[in-house]
Regions:
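Single, function-defining residue in the core of a domain
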Residues: 1-6, 17-24, 31, 35-41, ...
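A short, well-structured juxtamembrane/interface segment
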Residues: 7-13
C-alpha cells in the first residue's frame, strides 16, 4: 500500500523538485538491514549473511538498494531482496528514471549492462572507476591527458581524472554527460553530492530506526519499510518548500533544519496530518524556521586508510549452514 503511496507522492510533487542544469540528480547505493528471526521471514528466503563457506550470521539480513534525489533529498526508488545484488537492482531502477536525469555511482557499479541500460533510457551516468574496471576504460590510468573520450559497445563515454589537492592523488571517473560538463571542477562537485545517500541511510537507521521492526512477518516488514520512505519524503518535501532557493547548490556552505525534530513531530501526529487538521503546517514551518542553521561541508584532508576492522559477525553470533 505505502509503496504505491510513495510513487503517487513523487508524481504529485514532481514540479516542486529542483534540478541542476535541467537534470534530476540521483545517487544509488546499498544498505544492509537486520531483520527479526521468525519462521515467516526464514520461509521468505531471508537468511543470515555468509561469513564463511559454512557459516552465516544468526539474524536474517535484507539487502536494500536505493536511489536518492541528492538535490531535493527525497527517495526516488528502492529495491529489497534476500540476496546482495546492487548492480542488478540499479539496472532495474534506471528503467524508471527520467530522460533528463543523471545518476551517480561509486566504484562498485561500473559495468557494460548498466551503461547500455542508461543508453537505452537516454539518461546520464557518472561512475567512479576502480582499478579492475573494464579494459577500455583503463586507458585513463596511464594517459597523460586529463580527459579522454572512448566508445564502449557504441556508447560514447568521457573519461576524466580529478586530482585531490590535499592528498595529490587522482580519482578516475566515466560519464556520458555532454563534454562541456565533464570538467574537473564539475565532476568533483557532482560526485561530492553522492554523500547525501549515505546521510539518508544514517537517517533511516539512526533517526527513523528502521531496524527496530514492529512486525515479525515479511509483509509487515515491507509495509514498515515503504512507510518510512513515504514519511521521509514527506518531511523532506516540507523542508524543500519552506527553505529559500539556493543559487549555488554545490557550495561548501548550506542551510539545514533539524530533520530529527521535524520527523518526530510529523510521525507523532501522523493521523492528524492524514485528517488534514488545521494549524499543523504552521507548526512545521515554525520548526523549520527555528532550527535552520548555516553549516559547512568539511572535506577529508588526510589520506584515506583502509584498515581491517573486527568482524561485525563474531563467531558466537553465527550459525552453521551446511
Amino acid at each position: 500500500f505505502f509503496q504505491k503511496q510513495l510513487y503517487n507522492q513523487k508524481e504529485k510533487n514532481k514540479l516542486k523538485k529542483k534540478t541542476w542544469n535541467g537534470l534530476y540528480v540521483y545517487a544509488v547505493d546499498g544498505l544492509q538491514l537486520t531483520l527479526p528471526k521468525s519462521d515467516d521471514i526464514i520461509k521468505a528466503n531471508y537468511n543470515g549473511r555468509k561469513v564463511s563457506k559454512y557459516r552465516e550470521s544468526y539474524m536474517p539480513k535484507m539487502f536494500l538498494t536505493a536511489a536518492l534525489d541528492v538535490i531535493n533529498g527525497v527517495v526516488k526508488d528502492a529495491r529489497e531482496y534476500p540476496t546482495l545484488n546492487e548492480v542488478a537492482d540499479a539496472i532495474d531502477m534506471v528503467k524508471s528514471f527520467e530522460d533528463n536525469s543523471l545518476t551517480i555511482y561509486d566504484r562498485l557499479y561500473c559495468c557494460r549492462k548498466l551503461i547500455l541500460e542508461h543508453n537505452n533510457q537516454n539518461n546520464y551516468f557518472l561512475f567512479r572507476l576502480r582499478k579492475s574496471v573494464m579494459q577500455e576504460m583503463r586507458l585513463i590510468f596511464k594517459c597523460k591527458s586529463i580527459r579522454k573520450t572512448i566508445e564502449v559497445d557504441g556508447v560514447t563515454i568521457h573519461l576524466i581524472k580529478v586530482k585531490n589537492p590535499k592528498t595529490n592523488e587522482f580519482d578516475y571517473f566515466a560519464s556520458n554527460l555532454p563534454i562541456r560538463l565533464v570538467t574537473e571542477k564539475t565532476i568533483r562537485s557532482l560526485y561530492n553530492q553522492r554523500w547525501e545517500v549515505e546521510v539518508a541511510f544514517r537517517d533511516f537507521t539512526q533517526t527513523i530506526r528502521l531496524e527496530e521492526w514492529h512486525s515479525k512477518k515479511i509483509n509487515g516488514i515491507r509495509q514498515e519499510l515503504w512507510t518510512a520512505f513515504w514519511l521521509y519524503n514527506y518531511c523532506k518535501l516540507k523542508i524543500l518548500l519552506k527553505l529559500p532557493a539556493v543559487k549555488n547548490r554545490f557550495s561548501d556552505h548550506y542551510q539545514k533544519p533539524n530533520f530529527k525534530l521535524i520527523f518526530n513531530y510529523i510521525s507523532t501526529n501522523i493521523f492528524s496530518f492524514l485528517k488534514r487538521k488545521r494549524g499543523l503546517s504552521k507548526v512545521i514551518e515554525e520548526l523549520i524556521d527555528r532550527t535552520t542553521e548555516k553549516r559547512r561541508r568539511h572535506s577529508r584532508s588526510y589520506k584515506r586508510e583502509i584498515k581491517s576492522p573486527m568482524s561485525p559477525f563474531p563467531y558466537n553470533n553465527t550459525v552453521w549452514n551446511i
